[in-house]
A protein has these predicted regions:
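Bacterial N-terminal signal peptides
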Residues: 6-17
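Hydrophobic small-molecule pocket/channel-lining residues, especially in calycin-type beta-barrels
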Residues: 18-183
Length: 183
């Protein structure tokens, strides 16, 4: 089976698990799903040095994450600057909500690449945001999954994982715990 077909099937599975809005007790404005992330946060990042290699060597970074609403709240722009053992990170995420599809598209970039990656697409269900995309990594077609969870008014958790077997197994490679900065 082709890698694209595997990706489409994995995405279809994710979407089939989404609740039927017509059966919902009250309407949910999914365009505000990322409001918990707006503002300035301290971020502690753990990053797997060599993903999908069998290595379990991690490195850490600490820094600041800022996030502002754009497009009347139907999107947001996140910027991360962090320093650690392996140097300086500058990362950006552009999040856009498609009200017709009831899904978010997340476009990542870094100061290293200088371009937007293909989007991760997904939604929130029961307080967990799950987003998937297919990418090429070291010459291999992989799935990438991002999870946002444990959101409170002052903190949340993010985890990115790769799958080289089209979603059968996942290896976390970027984990961030964020705490809101006050003052």
């Amino acid at each position: 089976m082709s890698p694209i077909r595997h990706f489409v099937l994995a995405l279809a599975y994710l979407l089939s698990a989404a609740p039927d809005p017509a059966q919902s007790a009250s309407p949910h404005d999914a365009g505000h799903d990322f409001d918990f992330a707006l503002g300035t946060f301290h971020t502690h990042i753990r990053r797997l040095v060599h993903p999908l290699s069998g290595s379990n060597k991690w490195t850490t970074y600490d820094g600041t994450k800022s996030d502002v609403a754009i497009l009347g709240g139907q999107g947001s722009l996140e910027q991360i600057e962090a320093d650690g053992e392996k140097g300086h990170l500058e990362l950006m995420t552009l999040r856009l909500y498609n009200a017709v599809a009831h899904q978010w598209s997340l476009y990542f970039s870094s100061s290293k690449s200088g371009q937007l990656d293909s989007p991760s697409v997904g939604e929130f269900d029961n307080g967990v945001g799950t987003f998937l995309d297919q990418e090429s990594y070291n010459g291999r077609t992989i799935l990438v999954r991002q999870l946002w969870s444990a959101a409170t008014p002052d903190s949340y958790h993010f985890e990115q994982a790769f799958s080289a077997d089209f979603g059968k197994t996942w290896e976390a490679n970027f984990v961030a715990d964020l705490k809101r900065e006050h003052g």
